[in-house]
Every structure is written in C-alpha cells, then in structure tokens.
C-alpha cells in the first residue's frame, strides 16, 4: 500500500501559479468577514438557495435526478422521498445540514466518515451506508462506441480500512502541524479519498461533502452561500480531466496532485467572486424586482441567460424574471439571442 505524504509532496506544489491562487483566496477570505457582518438578512436568502442548489447538483453529477419542485420540497423537508433517487437526495440534505450546523466539531476521522456515509443512506433501504466496500471496485469510462474500460483501479476492499486509517492519520498530523497551507492540503486529501474509493456507492458525493467540511473547518465558508457543487457540475468535464491527470501513477506514489489542486482552487476563487457579486445585487433590495433585474443586465458584459439572472437574484421568482425579460424585449431595452437552452439576452 502506498504512503500518504502531506509534508514533502505539498511543498512541491507551490508553483507561482498555485501560490498566486492561494494568495487571492486569502484576500477573499479577509473580505468574507466584512460581508458576513454587514449583510445578515441577505445571506439568509443565499444560504437557503445554496442548500437546494448543492443538494441537486451533487446528486445530478452522479445521475440522481428529481424535478426542481420536488428537490425544493425535499430540501425544505416539506415532502417525504418517493423513490430511490429521492431517498439519496434526502440523505445528502441530512449530511449537508449536519456539516453546516456543526463543522467545527466534526473531524475527518474514519469513524466519523463512516457515520456521515451512514447518514447519507439513512433514507435508503438495504443498509447501504456506514460500512466500507465489501468487494473490489473499478472506476470505468465509456468510449464513443459505448465500450467500457477501466480508468482507475482503486485500493482493494481488504486494504480499505487500513488505507483510510493511514490517510486520515497522516492528514490530521499535517493539518495540526499547520506548516502547509490548508488550501493545498484539502484537495490532496480528497484526491487520495477518491483513489481509495472506500465505499460500494456514494464515493463522489461523500468526496464533495468532505470537501465542504474541510474548507469550512479551515475558515473558508463561502460554500454555505454559493453552491460549490453546482460550480463543479458546470465544469464536470474539467473536473474529471483533473481527477484522471492527478490519479495517474497514484498507486506507485508517482502521481502529480497539481491538476486536481489547481482545479479546486479555481472553484474556490469562482465561488468567492460569485459570492461578492450576489451580495452586491442583494443590497439593491430597495429597488423594485424588475429594476433589480435590469441592474443585473446593465452590469453584465455580453450575453446573460435567464438562469444566470435567477442565480444572482435568488429571491426573485422565475415568473417575475420571465415577465420582466419579456417586457424589456418589447420595450427594445434588450434583445433576445439564441434559442432553446442557449437563449440569452443582450443590451441593445
């Protein structure tokens, strides 16, 4: 079994590009406290929206779907799950809420990770959660002709317990020593977790929950207000490319963590930029809702979609956004471009 190194390997990752990304995130974190203190009411809205978006996106990445209406009902606990997909969505909501409410007291130890996995499947039948895989698994990919091939072979089932113990022990040693920036350590831990692939099912969703937990513990709580899972969903191909690049040679200890670390730092930067933008838009609540939508369009260079407007104005209903866009097109203030999912709007 390979060694888990969180001392020497991270030091090799401190390239000028990664150092610049880390420094930028530190700056955003400094401003984060000011936003949190000054915008309490606005943040409540962002929190509620992000909870729904995170739950939906993380499950969709794994092919678990329900309607938008059912998703909102499940996340707000106004409905009971009706099928397997909804059971898994409800379980994700439970674990995400646990992390949001008590991340300071949750440490990434094997027994805790097993408990979180148990809760992930708390609505599911058959006792799928709370124990490591009982058979070897393979991460496969399907080519253009529909043929499957092994992309990565994780740690065998009989070594999983030992691998998780060692991973968590070495990671927590480095975390507590505090010699390496936690922004670099966290993606390394997540990559190792995914290469172990400790569970029969739920590894991808657990990896994203653990990512949020660790970023929160390190003081980067932007994921509460902007869905990092949705940002990952939007860049899913890049995510899998980075994962594949960083997992090559992992068993031999010859892999490079750099692609995966850079990917996650990029997601964090994007999340902070969106957070600051959304808080700024929410400050305009004294304006009417149509005027706020108009202000969003005015501040956008190039095309903007209905979905982007709704993400920036999470407290404005879809009907109001659609009605306002229709009126602005009729008045000649904006023009509609494209068709179908790519439909957007530009200033005239």
Model-derived features: positions:
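FIC/Doc superfamily catalytic core
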Residues: 1-348
């Amino acid at each position: 079994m390979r060694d888990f190194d969180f001392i020497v390997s991270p030091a090799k990752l401190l390239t000028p590009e990664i150092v610049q990304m880390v420094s930028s995130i530190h700056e955003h974190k400094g401003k984060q406290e000011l936003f949190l203190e000054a915008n309490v009411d606005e943040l409540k809205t962002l929190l509620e929206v992000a909870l729904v978006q995170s739950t939906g996106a993380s499950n969709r990445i794994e092919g678990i779907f329900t309607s938008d209406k059912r998703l909102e009902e499940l996340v707000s606990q106004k409905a009971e799950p009706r099928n397997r997909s909804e059971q898994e969505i409800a379980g994700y909501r439970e674990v995400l809420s646990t992390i949001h409410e008590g991340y300071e007291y949750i440490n990434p130890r094997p027994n805790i990770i097993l408990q979180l996995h148990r809760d992930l499947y708390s609505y599911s039948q058959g006792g799928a959660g709370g124990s490591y895989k009982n058979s070897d698994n393979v991460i496969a990919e399907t080519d253009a002709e529909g043929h499957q091939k092994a992309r990565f072979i994780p740690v065998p089932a009989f070594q999983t317990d030992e691998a998780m113990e060692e991973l968590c022990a070495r990671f927590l040693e480095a975390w507590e020593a505090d010699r390496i920036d936690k922004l670099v350590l966290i993606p390394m831990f997540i990559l190792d977790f995914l290469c172990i692939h400790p569970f029969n099912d739920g590894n991808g969703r657990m990896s994203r929950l653990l990512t949020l937990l660790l970023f929160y513990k390190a003081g980067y709580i932007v994921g509460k207000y902007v869905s990092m899972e949705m940002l990952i969903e939007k860049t899913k191909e890049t995510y899998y490319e980075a994962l594949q690049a960083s997992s090559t040679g992992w068993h031999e200890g010859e892999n490079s963590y750099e692609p995966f670390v850079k990917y996650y730092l990029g997601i964090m930067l994007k999340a902070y930029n969106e957070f600051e933008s959304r808080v700024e838009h929410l400050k305009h609540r004294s304006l009417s809702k149509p005027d706020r939508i108009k202000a969003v369009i005015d501040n956008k260079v190039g095309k903007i979609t209905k979905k982007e407007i709704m993400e920036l104005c999470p407290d404005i209903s879809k009907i109001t956004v659609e009605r306002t866009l229709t009126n602005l097109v009729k008045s000649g203030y904006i023009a509609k471009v494209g068709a179908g999912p790519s439909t957007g709007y530009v200033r005239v």
